[in-house]
């Protein structure tokens, strides 16, 4: 004779990374968000000016609340607005001159191929994962003499930007500032150098533009303290007890989460049952989307003591996170056997 039992118990398991996002604001700092721009029409007539950036960028992270480390920094819909600039030079006894104004400057900041990857132990990332494109702004002015007599009226647009990327390494730092209910709070700072090298035509003269500086943005971030709590937030039932069973079906909230199900899902198709192909064997059919946490299969001949089930295949026991499809438990020779699923609550 065989019997089945599916439970979820509130023990302890290591914490995994949790997705979170926030809006970062470019900081007002004399050493950051100052982009030095150089224009060079040739003939030794280069000039430089500095634009100060303000703006925001949405940032996505994958945070381990146990240590405040992230494996991801993805930047989306960033907008950095720059102050106006003027470039003017006269040389060769007034035989060559220009006066150029750049106004209403703005740059888009985005991750090129999300997700942006961060080394979690150091917070360092390759800055060239992120774009910095000047895609708004007007260039007006004149050139004369040896570099041509031209009126300048050009625009940066998304179709005609001055394109650049991050350069070298950037850093992202998360500093825990305390807990608020089910959330862990962080202050966040992301810093990365940027560089642009582009050209535009003024008449027949090619004017080179280079820009270099370091972008720094900061903000605050809230992350659920555990991946189970993150699931409760996503299910619109924040902080419901891990061992709670609101519908009385014998399957706890924690087991629903670990199975990769929604709070209102029917768990019965995914619980242990006799394996019709193997007498006295068991079968655990897992959801196609994969499990969300390790699940330990335990067995007992009499319910008094439990031990990890042996001969589990095709995966190890505990069942690893992300497992889908059928997991089988071979017979152990007992005339009577109970099987249960044990899930441990993250710290």
Regions inferred by a protein language model and the residue ranges of each:
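Acidic, serine/threonine-rich low-complexity disordered tracts
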Residues: 194-221
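A short hydrophobic beta-strand element
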Residues: 133-134, 182-196, 213
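Boundary/junction segments of secreted and surface-exposed precursor proteins
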Residues: 15-32, 222-237
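A short, structured loop/turn motif at beta-sheet edges
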Residues: 174-188, 219-221, 303
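Short, composition-biased motifs enriched in small/polar/acidic residues
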Residues: 224-347
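Sec-dependent, cleavable N-terminal signal peptides
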Residues: 1-20, 347
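Predominantly extracellular/secreted and cell-surface proteins with exposed
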Residues: 29-181
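Low-complexity, intrinsically disordered Gly/Pro/Thr-rich segments
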Residues: 189-202, 323-328
């Amino acid at each position: 004779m065989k019997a089945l039992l599916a439970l979820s118990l509130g023990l302890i398991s290591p914490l995994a990374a949790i997705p979170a996002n926030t809006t970062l604001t470019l900081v007002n700092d004399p050493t950051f968000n100052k982009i030095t721009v150089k224009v060079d029409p040739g003939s030794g007539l280069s000039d430089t000016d500095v634009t100060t950036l303000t703006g925001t960028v949405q940032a996505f992270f994958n945070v381990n609340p146990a240590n405040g480390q992230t494996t991801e920094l993805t930047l989306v819909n960033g907008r950095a607005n720059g102050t106006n600039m003027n470039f003017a030079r006269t040389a060769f006894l007034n035989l060559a001159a220009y006066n150029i104004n750049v106004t209403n400057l703005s740059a888009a900041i985005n991750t090129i191929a999300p997700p942006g990857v961060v080394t979690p132990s150091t917070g360092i990332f390759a800055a060239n994962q992120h774009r910095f494109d000047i895609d708004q702004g007007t260039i007006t002015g004149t050139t004369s003499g040896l570099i041509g007599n031209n009126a300048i009226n050009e625009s940066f647009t998304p179709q005609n930007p001055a394109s650049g990327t991050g350069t070298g390494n950037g850093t992202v730092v998360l500093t825990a500032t305390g807990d608020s209910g089910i959330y862990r709070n962080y202050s966040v700072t992301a810093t990365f150098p940027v560089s642009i090298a582009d050209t535009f035509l003024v008449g027949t003269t090619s004017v080179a533009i280079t820009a270099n500086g370091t972008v720094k943005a900061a903000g605050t971030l809230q992350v659920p303290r555990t991946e189970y709590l993150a699931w409760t937030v996503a299910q619109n039932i924040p902080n419901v007890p891990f061992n709670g069973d609101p519908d009385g079906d014998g399957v706890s909230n924690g087991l629903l989460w670990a199975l990769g199900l929604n709070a209102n899902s029917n768990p019965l198709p995914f619980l242990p049952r006799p394996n019709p192909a193997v007498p006295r064997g068991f079968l655990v059919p897992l959801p196609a989307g994969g499990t969300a946490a390790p699940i330990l299969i335990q067995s007992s001949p009499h319910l008094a003591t439990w031990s990890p089930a042996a001969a589990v295949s095709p995966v190890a026991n505990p069942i690893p996170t992300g497992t889908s499809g059928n997991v089988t438990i071979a017979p152990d020779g007992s005339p009577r056997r109970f099987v249960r699923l044990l899930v441990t609550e993250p710290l």
